[in-house]
């Protein structure tokens, strides 16, 4: 089943979103042991005193929807954790760095669940769901950073940020340094490499139109990288 069958966060009404949030919070303690499975979802429901009908109402398509909602929840938690006035006072590059970092800080208590989600989405049949989830996160970060581009710049910056999100998340998952200090250094270097507007524009203009998208980072590439790292360990 692909992510095309999953409703996006913008399609959910408040009641369904709240019920999904409640079930997600209940299922998360079980995910490190059971993975993103029906077993973890059902265990969380039992903890909350919910029925199978409640689970079917919230996640009719099962664990895949639960993983997709985890990504949506993380994006909303990221935005809620950032002070809008403080963010507005930063340069655009600093805003992007701050938002990516806050997202990982929000996810830190659930690091093993993130690892399990990456493994789940690395399965080929689930890869489209992972690609769409990362793309949505990139959209939200650029929007929160105040980016209003609607031309080709929008596509290039979005794709480059997807690359930053993927590589930084992989680094973070394997980072054992105190308070993930090495990850924040890695993130700063990645942002410096690919999110300078001048360098982005230069790359886009130097590539013939039909080859632009192929030259940019993609969610699928992130999935392939995760799968190759799993095989290497």
Predicted regions and their residues:
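Short, amphipathic alpha-helix enriched in basic
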Residues: 7-53, 61-68, 72
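Hydrophobic alpha-helical connector segments
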Residues: 17, 21, 81-116
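Hydrophobic core segments within long, regular secondary-structure runs in both alpha-
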Residues: 24, 97-104, 135-142, 184-191
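Acidic/His metal-coordination segments adjacent to aromatic residues that form catalytic metal sites
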Residues: 85-89, 143-148
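Internal, conserved structured core segments that host functional sites
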Residues: 102-137
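Amphipathic alpha-helical packing segments from all-alpha helical-bundle domains
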Residues: 125-147, 155-162, 166
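Hydrophobic/aromatic-rich alpha-helical bundle segments in the mid-to-C-terminal region
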Residues: 147-209
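Long, charge-rich low-complexity segments
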Residues: 200-233
């Amino acid at each position: 089943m692909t992510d095309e069958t999953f409703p996006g966060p913008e399609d959910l009404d408040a009641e369904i979103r709240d019920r999904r949030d409640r079930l997600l919070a209940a299922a998360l303690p079980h995910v490190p042991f059971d993975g993103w499975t029906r077993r973890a979802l059902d265990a969380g429901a039992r903890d909350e005193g919910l029925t199978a009908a409640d689970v079917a109402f919230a996640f009719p398509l099962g664990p895949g929807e639960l993983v997709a909602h985890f990504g949506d929840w993380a994006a909303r938690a990221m935005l809620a954790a950032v002070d809008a006035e403080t963010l507005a006072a930063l340069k655009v590059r600093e805003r992007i760095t701050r938002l990516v970092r806050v997202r990982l800080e929000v996810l830190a208590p659930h690091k093993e669940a993130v690892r399990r989600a990456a493994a789940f989405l690395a399965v080929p049949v689930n890869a489209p769901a992972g690609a769409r989830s990362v793309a949505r996160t990139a959209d939200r970060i650029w929007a929160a950073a105040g980016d209003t581009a609607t031309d080709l710049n929008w596509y290039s910056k979005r794709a480059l940020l997807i690359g930053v999100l993927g590589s930084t998340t992989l680094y973070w998952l394997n980072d054992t340094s105190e308070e993930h200090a090495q990850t924040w250094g890695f993130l700063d270097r990645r942002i410096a490499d690919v999110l300078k507007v001048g360098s982005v524009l230069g790359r886009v203009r130097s590539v013939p139109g039909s080859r632009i998208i192929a030259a940019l980072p993609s969610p699928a590439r992130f999935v392939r990288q995760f799968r190759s790292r799993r095989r290497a360990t």
